[in-house]
């Protein structure tokens, strides 16, 4: 199979969407001899910040000398980004060979796997065959019934910031969502939690007690900023002083605190991670599309924020780094998101909106989004293509101005490709 054939098979239209449950992926991995059982893991869930936290953890573990796998979703530029070892995406020929091996197994299953389950099986098989020392594994959605939860008890089960998202599947209260996400906590693991409301923390604590798993909550009182510019951040966390990190925004400092708390937990469990690895790993963390400056004159920032909590963080970052500047907002969103509350956060900072349709079946049409955004009294232009939207954004933004591209991770790769062509 060629790479195009492999990707067409993975994304083929007759795969079902998200179907919670572990039976299908467990069956598929069983046909392969359960490779996932031969690897150590850090399992990360949460509503926001889980990808950034995964990237920090993987970078630190790699700097400590461990052969480190990283499994995340979605991708921004190429599908292969979703599974990496020591920062390198899965090679095309390896991906093709694995799909050729898994395809007949998946096709003959009476209850075939979903796309996410198939991709997860590919990643877990690759990590095991490459003899990774440890894999940082991001949950796709939820936790307890997510395909990634087929893995054995992880070294650490990490819960980042929890909020309302995917409510039709996970529940319509933060406590209900937390209960689902806490399903990744198993006996013989150590849980790490982003500080949250007492009612939410108690939900996680109940799960920990049932599993006999210790719980450590990150200490944001021990976190302080030293220097913060568009070039990066310097901060302190507990005994760590003057740590450097390229990821921007106060929310990333909080994600870093969760990552550092997890590193301390791993040390307690026998992993050798010295301070120099922590410093090097954080400084080298790369995670595109999170308040990422990709061009100057004008300043163009990419942010994959796709729910109200994300937009609170994005708005705070704009106020911090670009105080008083009028901002051109190029945006597109998925129709099932709470985009009203999202744009309530962003509208006061926008000089104008340019709407596009992300390349995703769940996307809201650019014209519909434009009609909605006109309620904020700002100029709004709907564009037929992302490339047209990028051209309009550049035309409408002065050289000393700023444009922010946001609303969906599914938008950003096409924005970058368009920027390279205009």
Question: Could you say what each language-model-derived stretch is?
Answer:
Residues 194-207, 211-216, 230-234, 299-302, ...:
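C-terminal helical cap/extension that packs against the catalytic core
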Residues 38, 134-137, 145-158, 162-166, ...:
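Nucleotide phosphate-binding/pyrophosphate-handling subdomain across enzymes
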Residues 408:
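Active-site-proximal loop/hinge segments that shape catalytic or ion-binding/gating pockets
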Residues 110, 118, 131-138, 154-242, ...:
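Acidic, Mg2+-coordinating active-site environments of NTP-dependent enzymes
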Residues 71, 194-195, 207-229, 246-250, ...:
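Beta-strand->loop->alpha-helix junctions that form or flank phosphate-binding loops
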Residues 57-62, 127, 266, 346, ...:
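Hydrophobic alpha-helical packing residues
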Residues 18, 22, 26-37, 63-152, ...:
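ATP-dependent carboxylate-amine ligase catalytic core
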Residues 1-48, 52-67, 76-77, 190-199, ...:
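N-terminal leader/targeting and accessory segments in enzymes
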